[in-house]
Amino acid sequence: MLIYLIPTAKEMSQNHTRFPATFPKKSYPILDVLANLSVKDLSKAYRISEDASQKEWLRIQALYNHTAPTYPAYKLFNGLMYRYLKRDSLSPKEEDYLKNHVYITSALYGIIPASFPIAEHRLDFQTKIKIGQQSLKHFWREDYNQFIDANQTYVSLLSSEFEDVFSTDQRQMWISTQFLEEKNGLLKSHSTISKKARGAFLTACIAKQCQSISDLKTLDFIGFSFSPELSTNHKFVYIKKEA
């Protein structure tokens, strides 16, 4: 079975049905650390303004007190990749595919199904906190590694920030993706291209109900198509050629 790994996002949208608060047991040590930080401490850890830290402090306290509303993760996150992912007006078949094949890698919740109910937060693996003596990446590494099953086929739509949580052996077990645009005869990539293409790629996978590696090679989305010349068995490259 194909399993897609996608990152979280800082931007969020609350315009969805709320669910009761829920929280994985593994995440409580992280929440304990966050709940004991002051607004000023959060500002330093997250590298954000104190106004933004005040908002995040209130979110954390709500999580800590089990009063934070939760929403399906794939609908709550609203970064650029998620805005290019079709999330509304899905057919029952498309919704089932998304729920069964797509997993989100979170610094707070671990690896969760795309539809897992989560609360608003902005924690990521660049946040400067320690859980005991461990960084967030080391805290989650064993759990992330155990998620990877040799009997499944994984497609990584992760940035390096999230891929680096996994050990090298696990990273060698998936297919990574790269999205390039042709400009003046040269192939270029940057963050905006990658984020848009990841969302559109996943939308195409859901629409086509991809079941195999071969299916991934036939996709065509927002002008991108598979490049057999630049791709390898462990890295699939998609190119958007100049008009």
From Swiss-Prot:
Record-annotated disulphide pairs: none
Pfam families, alphabetized: H2O2_YaaD (PF03883)
One cellular component term from this protein's GO annotations in UniProt: cytosol
Domain of life: Bacteria
GO biological process: response to hydroperoxide
Family: Belongs to the UPF0246 family.
Protein name: UPF0246 protein SUB1767
